[in-house]
Amino acid sequence: MKYYLIVGEASGDLHASHLMKALLKEDPKAEFRFFGGDMMSAVGGTRVRHYRELAYMGIIAVLLHLRTILRNMAFCKRDIVEWRPDAVILVDYPGFNLKIAKFVHEHTKIPVYYYISPKIWAWKEYRIKEIKRNVDELFSILPFEVPFFEQKHHYPIHYVGNPTAEEVRQFRAAYNVSGEEFRHEHGLDERPIIALLAGSRKQEIAGNLPQMIAAARRFGSYQLVLAAAPGIDAEFYDAFIGGSDVHVVRGETYALLSHADTALVTSGTATLETALFRVPQVVCYNTALPKLVGFLRRLMLKVKYVSLVNLIADREVVPELVANTFSEANIAEQLKRLLPDGAARREMLEGYEEVWRKIGEDSPSERTAKEMVLKVKK
């Protein structure tokens, strides 16, 4: 069978690569063609575009690159029609993928499977109409999405477990590098580590990293280690950390979290990864026009939280400094509460255990692959 996959960011590349491996187990003759990244390419198949050509966020960035986005979308539509896959698999990235779903539904008879649901429970809930009309099967990775889709909107979905939890479990089972070995390999001293996870897109990194570094530097008895995002070159980071005391690791985020004492994390999948490694964290997300964004967030968002940790727990487990609450001083204040072995740190770690329990121990890649192959072969 032939599978056409589309992702738009680094986390999607990771999750899709695991799904592709699982699809190959269920369908050894599977062929892949995709918009994706290096991890998907390592599994095999034909990459027609790198996700970096799609990964624009924010109104200004999208407008500046609108011609590129529209050109890629037109190419994607033509490519699907010409290749004639047995299924189109969309992974998150709804701004692009829902338009592709509409096209495929209206112009072909190819089934559309959505892996990692658009977060319409947070905003743009009206998109449920598009999903119902254009998506044949939706595979969810967040437990609270089940009542949202099935009870509120009467749209049956598959909850398959969480791929991040699966990936963390697999890594921890195989990883055996000691703290001493990790420090020696990366030229670190014996001080405890503050991990900096500043996002996977250049706009995010530029908006968050400088103040994250400034806040963390207030704690001289700790050393700062930055997890570089895949696809972002060293020269880009040098503009923010060149010649400073910030160490950089590349392609070793999970190894860093295995040895970190605490972390500053840009909102996204990384907040859940950090929690699953049981590293206390402060969630940070800077925006342009923070006061306006803070007001619009209160006005438009339908959820109380932005981090997956708090959304899954349905309460505040980790502090969120977003838009108008994001500042060097606020980051430092929240970080200070977590560094000693005090009550705030212990309460956060207890909250992490609650998140683990709610996610469960299913293997989402395998469950999703089995369902997809079964439906395609009908």
Describe each model-derived feature in a short phrase:
Residues 1-378:
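Nucleotide-activated sugar donor-binding and catalytic core shared by glycosyltransferases
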